[in-house]
Amino acid sequence: RLPERVRSTVTSALGLFTLAIGVRLFLQTKNPLIALGSLALGGLLGEWWQVEQRLTGVGARLEARFARGGEVEGAGGRFVRGFLTATLLFEVGPMTILGSIQDGLTGDYSLLAIKSTLDGFAALALASAFGMGVMFSTVGVLAYQGGLTLIAGQAQAVLSEAMMAEMTAVGGVLLIGLAIGSLLELRPIRTGNLLPALVMAPVLVWVVAQVAVLLQ
């Protein structure tokens, strides 16, 4: 186990890097209002469905079953924080979406391989800070990536370049929230409840396109 000051520095470095990546990805948006609308609607749905609370509940149940000794700190402990932070960090990234779609559409998994390498380094840093919970996040990540790959195989004619751009931008904002709320700990942000915004982004792109056609 790394010393506390080392864990703090490594986690802060990961937070700053995540923040920078999030800003860069958001700047890829073609229409910031769509990203804003996606986040607003996604946040409403996330609060209604209690996405983050459910993720926390899963982490708490795993903690009660598997954590030992000093790692048991209740629902707000290191195990749950590690599970939630790693799940969000590894799933929210647009590289997950793009890589899974690329794999599903063309069979090329090179982008997912690159992402897995990056996730491995991030997991080492997170595990030293948050403990055993990081390991259990891999189950959700594998299911999420596999599901996206399967869906992508059927969605070739659905996701346009504009839809992918806005999904990437929204993912960037979620990475910023993750960096601020979980890694840098500047203020609490229920980033998990914003995950539905990733689905709302292509929906809003389609709606705006249809409205534009009607107004012509």
Which positions does each model-derived feature cover?
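Juxtamembrane boundary at the C-terminal end of a transmembrane helix
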Residues: L204-Q216
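Membrane helix-loop-helix hairpins that form the core translocation module of multi-pass transporters
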Residues: L2-A60, A64
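Juxtamembrane helix-boundary/capping and inter-helix hinge elements in multi-pass membrane proteins
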Residues: R1-R7, D103-Y109, F130-M132, L186-I189
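Helix-loop-helix junctions within the multi-pass membrane cores of secondary transporters/permeases
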Residues: G76-Q156
